[in-house]
Amino acid sequence: MTFTCKALLCLGMTLGLWITVLTEFLPRPILRVQPDTVVSTQSKVIFFCERSQGAELYCLYKKGNPRNPRCKEIRPKPGKKVEFFISKIEPYHAGHYHCYYQIHGQWSEDSDALELVVTGVYDYNELRLSVLPSPVVTVGRNMTLHCISHSHYDKFILTKEDHKFTSSLDTQCIPPSGQCQALFVMGPMTSNHTGTFRCYGYYKHTPQLWSIPSEPLEIHISGLSKKPSLLTHQGHILDPGVNLTLQCCSDINYDRFALYKVGGVDIMQHTSQQTDTGFSMTNFTLGYVHHSTGGQYRCYGAHNLSSEWSASSDPLDILITGPIQMSTLPPITSMPPDQLESYVNALIGVSVAFLVFLFILIFIILQRRHQRKFRKDGEEAQKEKELQYPTGAVEPISRDRDQQKRSNAAAATQEESVYASVEDMETEDGVELDTWKPPEGDPQGETYAQVKPSRLRRVEAIIPSAMSREQLNTKYEQAEEGQEVDGQATESEEPQDVTYAQLCSRTLRQGTAAPPLSQAGEAPEEPSVYAALATACPGAVPKDKEQ
């Protein structure tokens, strides 16, 4: 019994080692796809799983779903490969694929992953691809491919027609325009960069689902071979409607020539014609010219067996006469949707800015009108206040004559300004009368008088707005007789003295008039002081009182 158990154990170990060795020697299959790993929706795809001779069963599965493989059995003739068809590609077909096979009941390892990308999933916004400085680049220099879209994709990817060149970049969104872009810098340029390029957009969470492609952009590399010549027989300055033909020729036997307009995208290529003199040439007929035909042109030569073009010809400028077009925008009906959207957005932005500016302007005008009206009302109120002062009331008088407002222009021409300021003094017995000449800039030659009594507590000044000379003379005569001024000064019940200043001329004369004696022959406590300017009133102050 013990011997039987040992024999069975040895047999099992031997079979296990043999199976392990057999599995290790089964090579990995190779998985391929046609027409390409990047396909558009609704297209047909064929997967090929290949291995060495003798496989009996092949299986294909998508990563993430290994339990539901698609398997094909090869009988009665085992072969090297098997085909798996997908008649119509849908977005859910995108992903990573593997295949494996079986020989004598043993399974091989999985093939390397094959990524299938489905394009055309997002078609709501078209992408645009452009190149700087031009689609024809001199060998050894750099160029920049610019991919832009209104959709906020996470990444843009740039591909060549054979998908041998693939590069992806994160998008950069421009807030004012709402566009996203990516700049692909390429260089130094070689002949391997010649070809047709496209760009796509996709999101990070679905990297195998791409947008519709941009329009194809052809890139050509110009080399160091001899440049051709570009000529025109119609001249450089043309009228609209003239039929224009450009001729490109060279003494090198180029197989074809290409014509490129600087700043454009399209490149015209024609087969060259050999002349008896050994020149190669071709004609590019541009048809009847219009304003968009004007610009700068260059031509290149190329051989059929080389993807590299010659050096650029000297530039040829074509000018079109006629009136200058004020607007270069195409009609709205002929704009593509993306350009129409940009145009509408720009128009809305300009309109909003204009309305905001108009609102601010109206606000400023209304505010200034309100301030002017408020100032005018204040001036009228001030005039009314000045006119409402009763006789004998104190009216504040400004020293600045230029700022005084008069209610009656006729009276203003008859009166002369009088300025009097009365200040308290520290001493109780002193009386001062200060006079000074008017400023040189005063056109009316006004005279100022400042009277400073010692015990003044309150000042009452009566200054008429317009006073005739007869009235002034009467006032002075009364002042000489001591009937009015002295009576008011002696009979005042309040503890204050009243001082009067009368100015009626440009010459200041100062006098002290003694008040009349009382019945007992006693003088009052303090005399009154008079100051007068009187050229027209010489008798206002008695001569015996002058100093």
Curated annotation (Swiss-Prot):
Extracellular topology ranges: 24-345
Motif (ITIM motif 1): 417-422
Record's signal peptide: 1-23
Amino acid composition bias (Basic and acidic residues), ranges on this chain: 377-387
Keywords carried by this UniProt record: Cell membrane, Disulfide bond, Glycoprotein, Immunoglobulin domain, Membrane, Repeat, Signal, Transmembrane, Transmembrane helix
Record motif ITIM motif 3, residues: 498-503
SMART domains registered for this protein in UniProt: IG (SM00409)
Keyword Nuclease applies: no
Compartment(s) of residence: Cell membrane
Domain of life: Eukaryota
Chain span(s) of sequence motif ITIM motif 4: 528-533
The protein's name in its UniProt record: Neutrophil immunoglobulin-like receptor 1
